A protein has these predicted regions:
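Short, linear, compositionally biased motifs with a strong N-terminal bias
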Residues: 10-11
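N-terminal signal peptide c-region/cleavage motif recognized by signal peptidases
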Residues: 14-16
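Positively charged n-region of N-terminal signal peptides that target proteins for export
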Residues: 1-4
């Protein structure tokens, strides 16, 4: 009788543990609109400090634009390119600078350049919190991808204390 009770207890404990870990939903972290705007403002301030007129976009973890700002003399194309850089970084889970190298002609991943919205030039980075990507930032309009990257990094740094990087 003891064996049956112990077996039943073990079976119930196993079933309870499985029931707790098997769910139909998943909880994720997302940037608030206030955090997205804070990052956009910081990135733009850094670009202005360097003398660049740019557009800055922040997208959520799904690539949907949360905040977008174009400086008054930034080119008409820069808001779209900034949003596409942020989208590319989030979608491919890596910086656009790294993707630029990995997708050069002759590389196995060069076909990615034909994906709509793919932007393989520096200036797109990811926000991470607790080991998960929670959004991306894209900057367009500085004279190089490296300069765009430096401004995007300022946007990420502005949220460093708010995110568990």
């Amino acid at each position: 009788m003891k064996k049956i009770l112990l077996s039943a207890a073990a079976l119930l404990a196993t079933a309870a543990a499985l029931a707790q870990t098997s769910t139909a939903t998943h909880t994720v972290r997302v940037l608030t609109p206030e955090a997205a705007q804070k990052a956009v403002n910081a990135a733009m301030a850094e670009c202005r400090r360097q003398g660049f007129q740019v557009a800055v976009a922040v997208v959520d973890r799904s690539g949907v634009t949360q905040a977008l700002l174009r400086d008054r003399f930034a080119g008409a194309h820069t808001p779209t390119v900034a949003a596409d850089k942020a989208w590319t970084a989030v979608s491919f889970r890596t910086s656009t600078t790294d993707l630029a190298r990995a997708t050069q002609a002759g590389q196995p991943s060069s076909g990615l350049r034909s994906v709509p919205r793919f932007t393989g030039v520096g200036g797109g980075l990811n926000f991470e919190a607790g080991g998960s990507i929670v959004g991306g930032i894209g900057v367009s309009g500085a004279p190089s991808g490296d300069a765009d990257d430096s401004c995007a990094k300022a946007g990420i740094a502005a949220l460093r204390d708010d995110l568990e990087l």
